[in-house]
Amino acid sequence: MTTFEGKKVRTALAASTVAAVAIVAAACGNKSDGLGTSGDTAAGVDIKREAAGDITTNGGARRLDGDQTKAIADSIQKSKAKNVILVIGDGTANQELTLARDYQWGAGGQIPGIDQLPLSGDYTTYALNKDTKKPDYTTDSAASGTAWSTGTKTYNGAVGVDVNGKAQRSILEIAKANGRKTGNVTTTELQDATPAVQVAHVAQRKCYGPVETKEKCGSDSLANGGPGSITEQLLAARADVTLGGGWKTFQQTADAGEYNGKTLEVQAKERGYQIVRSGEELDGIKDANQDKPLLGVFAEGNLPRLWDKATATKEGGKEPAVTCSPNPAFGATPKLQSLTKKAIDLLKNDKGFFLQVESGSVDKANHDADPCGQIGETVQLSDAVSTALEFAKQDKDTLVIVTGDHAHTSQIIETGSVTPGLTRTLNTKDGSTLTVNYGTSLDPGEEQHTGGQVRIAAYGPGAANVVGVTDQTDPFFYITDVLGLDRTKK
């Protein structure tokens, strides 16, 4: 707890300016989240934000128990950090967070980790039209990821290049050039847009390997004098820790360059990568560095979703409510939380590190009109954030940032109703039911992104930079500034 005018108060998930302006906001915590309930002594705040009691009584649904002005001001820390952990929920905006909270933790509950971040705001996510150079109001993951990773707006589909096709350096590349350790973790294929934007520069996001690159990104192909496919550039970028899916692309064969005629798996081995294919093998890794970087690939494509499908249908809202269940296909797949913890353990060092972590299938389940798959991957996101926060609280020199890359289609609507779209009704933690609508397509698998601004929240040194309305390009600048990086260093 923090004392304000003689009263104990909790902090808010919001922010204030350093000088005189306090900006009201809201945050939460969890009594059983492993982060403790005695208060965050590193930041001088108690990140706890659940309903006060019986939500049917006056004041029972309150998440605040006093004036927050001083508590918020006290949560602002120094502006330099040794480490930055950027956690992305792909396709995760406020509707997706609310759906997960309502289902898994209850309407008056809290999302562990995510709702515990003391400072927050929203950022704009628009892309650019490749031809007109004017705003494209609904972004994809390639353009959005390029924005935060390089500080440059671009067209949908572009990975690490501007609207004219010119390569833009990423935070990971700059951090590595400045002597920091680097990591890239995802639940998707490592070649997918969000992980790719930190390590590659191609005209089209589907240029995973040499085969696709020659077909879709001709000038980027090694055979045509370009930098190569996303996977080839990933290997050349040489992050200290790289964990995710996408093994099938590593079976493609290079068609030019030093490794011509060899598979990308063989290339990785010859470049000195430690390759692991299971959680058990990952547990055995003790070090990862530039002499022996770690490449963990745990699925042929995307990692399986934690929870089984419950696809929405035309009449799903009227059908009996569904309770989500574990996905049998997940099996022994490493969870995002364990991948995050392992990456942090391998990256922590005296000089500092930059780590990007993505829960990528919130988006993919949203495209599929699959609320249970979507919520399960938001639970994975929550667990990863809790792990990052636990480290940051102990380290006291780590900035944790959590955001989505774009808004998506899922909506909570009137319970039991149907729409012109696809719906599904779920049983919730509260013992009630809610109905989810997917209204941008009648075909599961074809649901579309939407163009709303997206929440961004943070904890640690420099966290106040997320406050208010910012743009998706802003994180590139304040992350590199907080880390004290020379953006011109090669």
Please provide the spans of the model-predicted regions:
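Glycine-rich phosphate/pyrophosphate-binding loops
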Residues: 172-173, 177-197
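C-terminal motif of bacterial Sec signal peptides marking the signal peptidase cleavage site
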Residues: 24-27
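N-terminal low-complexity, Pro/Thr/Ser-rich intrinsically disordered segments
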Residues: 34-80
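A post-motif C-terminal structural segment
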Residues: 53-63, 76-82, 92-97, 102-139, ...
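Bacterial N-terminal signal peptides that target proteins for export
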Residues: 3-15
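His/Cys-centered metal/cofactor-coordination and adjacent catalytic loops
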Residues: 154-165
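Bacterial signal peptide processing site
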Residues: 29-32
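N-terminal amphipathic, basic-rich helices that act as targeting or association modules
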Residues: 83-91, 176
